[in-house]
Amino acid sequence: MYYLTIDQGQLLTGIIAEHGMSGMWFIWASWIGTFVIPLVFAPLWRKMDFMTDNQFLLFRYPGKSGWFLYQFRAIYVGGFVVTLALCFHLIGFARIAAFYFDISQENALLLTGGILCLFALKNVFDLKLKMDVLHAILFFVSLAVIVFSLWNLEGSKEAFFTFFKAHPEKKSLFPTNENTWFSLLVFIGIQWWSCNLFDGSGPEMTRFTAVKDTKGAILTGLVPIVVSFLVSFIMIGHILLILGLKNNQINPEFHYVESVFQVVPEVMKPIILLGFFGMFITTAEPLMKWGASLFTIDVVKGNFHPTLSEKQEKKISFGTMIFLSLLAVIFAFYIGNLQSLIKLIFSISAGVAPVYILRWIWFRINAWSQLSAMLSSAVFTLLYPSFHTYLLFSNYPMQESRVVVVTLLTSCVWVIVTLLTPNQSTEVRLNMLPIVESRMIFIRRFTIAILLGIVFLGIVALSWHLLLNN
């Protein structure tokens, strides 16, 4: 879980305010699998040359079933999944815009959606060079101003522990009751594999295919992890300072936004806004491009118009990005907080992730396996709240219980479907072995990556234990 996104400050503030430091295992659990992509999958993606990650499906799954999955995933991921991810970032910046311009949350959502549409135009027609580096610099400057302003407030050093003095039970890194222990076990035992993008497929796949060698692919995956590790301490540290300040906001996620603009000097507020805006665009643009490429290249060009010109591709991509932006705005009107949204996404992902990982070495898995996992995981996730009170897990938190039940049910569904559908493993093995080399090499690298992730998880937890108790 990387910390350079517009919504992270709000999300983490909400988690710590509601659950205390033990709630951070929801985020920290991602360290277990964070090295899997750069050490295991990035070198594999570098060996292949695909315009979209969806094209891997035609390579991995032969026959009509592979083609059907290829089409379905382009629409499902390009429409539904990308919209949810866009919605997450859109809500984060809309809250900032609402407070800065003193407008309603509804108007801020419409304003932010309009901005996304404008940047979709810039994306497609290449009006100027990508500004990711400038956006990152602006964000770091903004973060530095926020931290400096908080640290120079009167009594700020004491404010670091003010929140824990008022809520001593929230200082502990470990759960204090049965329900929170259950949540911790779910985070570490199941949810960790849904915190990242499974096997590196998605918008980041193109970063791995663009490098020249395996070393470059690994470094491309490792650099964001190192940056994330360092920034995480700054993020949580300044959030603890913010939680120590008095605030009238009922929603702790809004507490972060209001406090930031209260503590920084008036002259610096436009810089803060620009920093948040730059990071919002940097994270939203790749998602829009990913969704548009899936629809334009895999659906339209792959089915209806193989000879699509570059100009026509741009028009369709632009239209798709506009549609995704507007759809994200509509979704955002019905979402109350970022925690509920990300837990919904993690629940859907937890049921699907095993297929994405195992498909590289278990050649019996076919297109129907992945299709059934995607459908059942989404359906079970959406239906679960209606049945929670009738199940054995009814005494435990609903969202964590949902992850367990959805993962178990989805796994049963796709394994049964795998065994009942045609075995194409002979043909698949011929395609995959030159890429994977051998199952033993894959398993060895995967094991090393997991062990390294567990070590980093221990370092993070131990570091915060020492910081909070010394």
For each feature predicted by the language model, list its residue ranges.
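Membrane-embedded helix-loop-helix hairpins and adjacent transmembrane boundary segments
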Residues: M1-N470
